[in-house]
Swiss-Prot record:
Location of region: Disordered: 154-231
Biased composition (Pro residues): 220-231
Acidic residues biased stretches: 184-194
Identification of the protein by name: Uncharacterized ORF3 protein
Biased composition regions of type Low complexity, renumbered to the chain: 195-207
Length: 231
């Protein structure tokens, strides 16, 4: 076993030394291949960013000074010229001169990384303290209203036992305000005209029973759309 092979396989070898050796092998291989199709003497004119990458994205060169299986990384991106990258890849893999010192076992083209514009996205509802405060107060108010509804429905008997009707068959008005509250109770009128909108005895809803209710009782009629929160 040659000294170069033993050095490359040594577990105590410094990573920088291994990287430099891989970089030298990479330059040797690319330069040799470049001379096959171009005489400009500068392979960097045809290969952009000629530098190794990490070993998990690499090709392997075998037979070089006995260093069988030495990993060499490539970052080859065609920049100019008429050469087809696939032809370059095939010629390296096959070898035009029959030499197997730089036989290519695996080829991974490393694409040129995209440089994205660095922008910090602004989180929603936090770009301005005023916006977040307004949204927070609206959410709190809504939650308080929902909690009141849940509390009313979780009482001992949220649905009145008279099925929406009074003791003498009169339409019951007490259950009509179960799911909403008057914002100005002192300004509310005692007139029952608004109640007749949804507690009329001749309404077709009076004959509809809720199948899941105990005893098949009729649920209370809901208020009009403009009178509060309802489901």
């Amino acid at each position: 076993m040659s000294a170069s092979h033993s050095l490359s396989q040594s577990p105590n070898l410094h990573p920088d030394f291994t990287y430099k050796r891989q970089e030298a092998l990479w330059k040797q291989l690319v330069s040799a291949e470049h001379r096959k199709f171009c005489s400009c003497g500068d392979y960097t004119q045809h290969f952009r960013f000629p530098s190794p990458v990490k070993e998990d994205e690499c090709i392997r060169v075998v037979g070089e000074e006995g260093g069988d299986g030495v990993a060499v990384s490539y970052h080859v991106t065609k920049e100019s010229g008429d050469e087809d990258p696939e032809e370059v890849m095939a010629s390296i893999a096959v070898g035009d001169d029959g030499d197997d010192d730089l036989e290519l076992c695996k080829w991974n083209l490393k694409p040129e990384p995209l440089i994205l514009k660095q922008t910090d996205p602004q989180p929603l509802l936090t770009s301005s303290p005023g916006i977040s405060t307004v949204m927070g107060s609206s959410k709190t108010r809504l939650m308080n209203e929902l909690l009141e509804i849940i509390h009313a429905l979780s009482g001992p008997d949220p649905w009145e036992s008279d099925g929406g009707m009074g003791p003498q068959g009169e339409p019951s008005k007490s259950n009509s305000r179960l799911l909403y509250s008057d914002p100005n109770p002192e300004d509310s009128s005692s007139d029952d005209s608004e109640m007749s909108y949804f507690s009329s005895s001749d309404s077709t809803d009076a004959d509809i029973t809720y199948p899941n209710m105990e005893g098949g009782r009729t649920p209370p009629r809901y208020p009009p759309p403009n009178m509060g929160i309802y489901f």
